[in-house]
Amino acid sequence: MKKILFLCTGNSCRSQMAEGWAKQLHPDAMEAYSAGTNPGSVDPRAIKVMAEAGVDISGHRSKHASEFKDITFDLVVTVCDNARESCPVWFGKARKLHKSFEDPPFLAKDAKNEEEALGHYRRVRDEIKAFVSELVKY
């Protein structure tokens, strides 16, 4: 089973979604984790749109990447440009992969209403699902 870490800045939205999808789509192929370079808290809208898709991330918490420095990962996936630039060096021989997704909280801040805001989250959720579904090839 491959150990995979999804890394973004806040570990609040995109990396949380990716971890949730990996556990849902590939439970026998991936041991998935997520972390941030500057963690905050899990975004309630991310929890909501993942629940709509049948994935429960309500029990997740935001974690700093340093919590995983003693784990040997097979793959570290950065899901935002900032995390790619500041990816910790201690991941050693882990293969590194970058796939940038737009930031739903940033997109949602100009939304006219909650439904429009959630639309941004749903679109990114679905893009992350498509990406994670193909990750078993790596």
Regions found by a protein language model. Give the residues of each.
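Short, charged/polar "capping" segments at the starts of alpha-helices
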Residues: 40-42, 83-86
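Conserved active-site segments centered on acidic
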Residues: 1-67
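Residues at the C-termini of beta-strands that transition into short coil/loop
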Residues: 36, 80, 100-102
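Short glycine-rich anion-binding loops that position phosphate/pyrophosphate groups of nucleotides
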Residues: 12, 81-84
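Conserved acidic residues
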Residues: 74
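Phosphate-binding/catalytic loops
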Residues: 84-138
